[in-house]
Amino acid sequence: MSRKGSTPQRTVLPDPKHGSETIARFINMVMQSGKKSVAEKIVYGAMDVIGEKNPNAVELVQKALDNVAPAVEVKSRRVGGATYQVPVEVRSSRRMALAMRWLIDSARKRGENTMPRKLAAELLDASESRGGAIKKREETHRMAEANKAFAHYRW
């Protein structure tokens, strides 16, 4: 833990093409090894694929993120030698981060031939409440529901 207090939250500039801060964050999450131009090609390529079927791709991405974002998650809490999975509510910034991470991970596991197509297919599925990312959210919610008895261990 840092002794100097928490670092201030850095702001993310909106992306140049759509002017959306959410899309800019999404691009940063897709990025690997600092290759932002590659990440931009992937995200914008996916949005072009979505644009063929749905005229407003930014809204569809937002809807997909809202559908995937978890309301609760479980955190491990050690009490007297036993470790309990305690359900806790997820704060909004973490909700979006988890939603993006799960969408990207699910897209990478898909069978389509290019990453933009994989990401577009996963976003379309998530906007219609199906796909791997939605399955991950349901699994997280199920875990929280199963461990509801330990909710009083919240900190």
Swiss-Prot record:
One of its GO terms (molecular function) is tRNA binding. Disulfide bonds: none annotated. GO terms for cellular component: cytosolic small ribosomal subunit; ribosome. It holds the Pfam family Ribosomal_S7. GO terms for biological process: ribosomal small subunit assembly; translation. It comes from the Bacteria. Keywords: Ribonucleoprotein, Ribosomal protein, RNA-binding, rRNA-binding, tRNA-binding. InterPro entries: Ribosomal_uS7, Ribosomal_uS7_bac/org-type, Ribosomal_uS7_CS, Ribosomal_uS7_dom, Ribosomal_uS7_dom_sf. Part of the 30S ribosomal subunit. Contacts proteins S9 and S11. One of the primary rRNA binding proteins, it binds directly to 16S rRNA where it nucleates assembly of the head domain of the 30S subunit. Is located at the subunit interface close to the decoding center, probably blocks exit of the E-site tRNA. Belongs to the universal ribosomal protein uS7 family. PANTHER family: RIBOSOMAL PROTEIN S7 (PTHR11205). This is Small ribosomal subunit protein uS7.
